[in-house]
Curated annotation (Swiss-Prot):
This is Small capsomere-interacting protein. Pfam families: Herpes_UL35 (PF04496). GO terms for biological process: viral process. Its main location: virion. Interacts with the major capsid protein/MCP. The gene is SCP. It comes from Equine herpesvirus 1 (strain Ab4p).
Amino acid sequence: MAADKQQQQAPVAFNPADPPNIKAANFKDMLPVDVITILNQNIDELDYTKYTEDEISEGLKQLFMGTARTMVSLRQRHLKSLVRRSDMFAQNDASTWARPNIGLKRTFPPRFMQPISED
């Protein structure tokens, strides 16, 4: 039971009820699930009437940048377990002649296709 309670508690790196004090740098050792847990725990306490529109916007910007930082951190922690990234641009392969000069591997099919209408 204590393990469940400990698992639900997220490290407090920001207070969603105080947008001017949300800083992306404070999200350094957090996971995305920690951010969601903090937001869910404080959902009923949010009252932004005492803050200006600029303070709220800056707080949201910092929240999004901090959350993105947690996602990058999570990916880096699991780098050895992930599928290797593939090149976005096409290499020399059998269908190189059929692709436009840009050669985006996953964007352009080797031929033009048109759906057949039943009308």
